[in-house]
Structure formats: structure tokens, C-alpha cells
Curated annotation (Swiss-Prot):
SMART domains: CYCLIN, Cyclin_C
S-S pairs: none
GO molecular function: cyclin-dependent protein serine/threonine kinase regulator activity; transcription corepressor activity
One GO cellular component term noted in the UniProt record for this chain: transcription repressor complex
Modification after translation: Phosphorylation at Thr-282 by MAP kinases is required for ubiquitination and degradation by the DCX(AMBRA1) complex.
Compartments, as annotated in UniProt: Nucleus; Cytoplasm
Domain of life (superkingdom): Eukaryota
Modified residues (Phosphothreonine): T282
PROSITE patterns, alphabetized: CYCLINS
Chief localization: nucleus
Encoding gene per record: ccnd1
Subunit structure: Interacts with the CDK4 and CDK6 protein kinases to form a serine/threonine kinase holoenzyme complex. The cyclin subunit imparts substrate specificity to the complex.
Protein name: G1/S-specific cyclin-D1
């Protein structure tokens, strides 16, 4: 029998065990103090930018999210990239023709911060249909670093999610799906301009509360009822319960509108495909042709 070599190596990323010391209250309080230093200006569209409007930000944010999803980036990459983008736009007037270049640059930086194998400049340029050259991306990277004052360790909503999950009376089997739902809400909030001024801790708490509400986990424990959960999380982040409740409602409303738009897009595409099939399957009678 011939000797055969079996390669058992895989491309899975090696991860360290979760350190419980990173989930203590001292770390949480430090993040709550630090998050204010990384908040972008909520009115930069009026005060700083002359060409860029909220609709353009929405378009480039959706594109950035699609790139991150297709490249299977870490969950933290997209919100961090959007934080860089908003902070840059808060201080530097930018032409609308350079907005996609800025978005690609922010993903480039965030990927370096959070990925074991970061995105390359060449790959990001491909996603711009080669409208951006690698050299331009690297030049923009230096400009972005300068405007961000080389402070890239932004506090994002993802940093708070694990702290909240560790404090909630949730079975371990439910934590994974709850975490995934909360991360999805965080990414959704990052695409919407209405959450630019919201602190990361508020977005994270609202996302966790909305996830618990959506998964009906509140029925398993009285502590997870809507009012009790809101009061508890507001105490953790030192916020007013009404503000947190309003944030949660905004997130739920954003989810509904996003799902509605997605369904409309799917139905439109389906109708278009059906029309194309009908046209291709129905031969034209020569007598109907007006020569």
C-alpha cells in the first residue's frame, strides 16, 4: 500500500481563552470614561462638510458592510471603520468623489487593528472596481492617521457587549445567538446617521435589550423583562432609563425599516426575473412584426 500524507492543517484562526479579568467592573468603568474621547461630531454634515450628505454616508456604509461580510472580517472591524470615517469627516472637509476612497481606507486601518490577517490594499481596490489605486489608498491612510491623531484604539459598542452578557442571567446556550443578534444590531446602527451622536455603551445596551426582546428570552427570567432589563442596563452604563428605552425603540424601528426595504428589493428582483423568463419563453410571431 502506498504511503499517503494527510495534511490536517486548516486556516482557522487561533484564539486565546477569554480572560475573565477583562470583564471586571474596573475595565467597564474605564471604557465608559474613555468612550467620550472617540465620539464624532453629530452635526458635521452642516458644520464641516459641503458636498457630502447623510444619504451618501448611508451608501458608502452599506458598501463597507458588504465588503466586511464578504471577506468574513471580525465583527469589530465594520463599526470601528465607521468610527474612523465619522471622526475624519468631523474635522476634514471631503469631496464626495473621495468618499469611497475614505471608506476603503477606514476599513484598511480597522482591519489592521482587529484582524489576524488584515485586508490588503490591492483587495480593497478591487472592491472599488479599481476606481482607487493602491498608491492612493496608502496616501489616504497617512492623511487619515494624521487627522485621527494616530489614536485608533476607539471604544466601540462591541467592547461592551461581552460585559453586558456576563452580567445577565442567561444560559450559556443562549448567549451565542444573543451575541450574534446584538452584533447585527450594532452593525445596523453604524450604517444609520441617527446613531452618530449616541455613545457606544448606549448602542450596545440598546442592542442587547432589543436582542433579548426579539428572542423572547424575557419569558425565561423575570430579570429579563423589558422594564427590569432596561433599568438594570441603564444602571450599568450610568444612563437615564428613558434614554436607553428610546435608543432600543430606535434600533427596533431601524430593523423593521431595513427588513421592509430588503423584502421590497427581493420582490422587485423576483418580479424582474419572472418578466425576463416570460419574455424569453414566448416566441415572437412573425405576423406581429411591423416591418
Amino acid at each position: 500500500m502506498e504511503h499517503q500524507l494527510f495534511c490536517c492543517e486548516v486556516d482557522t484562526i487561533r484564539r486565546a481563552y477569554q480572560d475573565s479579568n477583562l470583564l471586571n467592573d474596573r475595565v467597564l468603568q474605564t471604557m465608559l470614561k474613555a468612550e467620550e474621547n472617540y465620539l464624532p461630531s453629530p452635526n458635521y454634515f452642516k458644520c464641516v462638510q459641503k458636498e457630502i450628505v447623510p444619504k451618501m454616508r448611508k451608501i458608502v456604509a452599506t458598501w463597507m458592510l458588504e465588503v466586511c461580510e464578504e471577506q468574513k472580517c471580525e465583527e469589530e472591524v465594520f463599526p470601528l471603520a465607521m468610527n474612523y470615517l465619522d471622526r475624519f469627516l468631523s474635522v476634514e472637509p471631503t469631496k464626495k468623489t473621495r468618499l469611497q476612497l475614505l471608506g476603503a481606507t477606514c476599513m484598511f486601518l480597522a482591519s489592521k487593528m482587529k484582524e489576524t490577517v488584515p485586508l490588503t490594499a490591492e483587495k480593497l481596490c478591487i472592491y472599488t472596481d479599481n476606481s482607487v489605486r493602491p498608491g492612493e489608498l496608502l496616501q489616504m491612510e497617512l492623511l487619515a492617521l494624521n487627522k485621527l491623531k494616530w489614536d485608533l484604539a476607539s471604544v466601540t459598542p462591541h467592547d461592551f457587549i461581552e460585559h453586558f452578557l456576563a452580567k445577565l442571567p442567561i444560559h450559556q446556550s443562549s448567549k451565542q445567538i444573543l451575541r450574534k443578534h446584538a452584533q447585527t444590531f450594532v452593525a445596523l446602527c453604524a450604517t444609520d446617521v441617527n446613531f452618530i451622536a449616541s455613545p457606544p455603551s448606549m448602542i450596545a445596551a440598546g442592542s442587547v435589550a432589543a436582542a433579548v426582546q426579539g428572542l423572547y428570552l424575557k419569558s425565561t427570567d423575570s430579570c429579563l423583562s423589558s422594564q427590569n432589563l432596561t433599568n438594570f442596563l441603564s444602571q450599568v452604563i450610568r444612563s437615564d432609563p428613558d434614554c436607553l428605552r428610546s435608543c432600543q425603540e430606535q434600533i427596533e424601528s431601524l430593523l423593521e425599516s431595513s427588513l421592509r426595504q430588503a423584502q421590497q428589493h427581493i420582490s422587485t428582483e423576483t418580479k424582474r426575473v419572472e418578466e425576463d423568463v416570460d419574455l424569453s419563453c414566448t416566441p415572437t410571431d412573425v405576423r406581429d412584426i411591423n416591418i
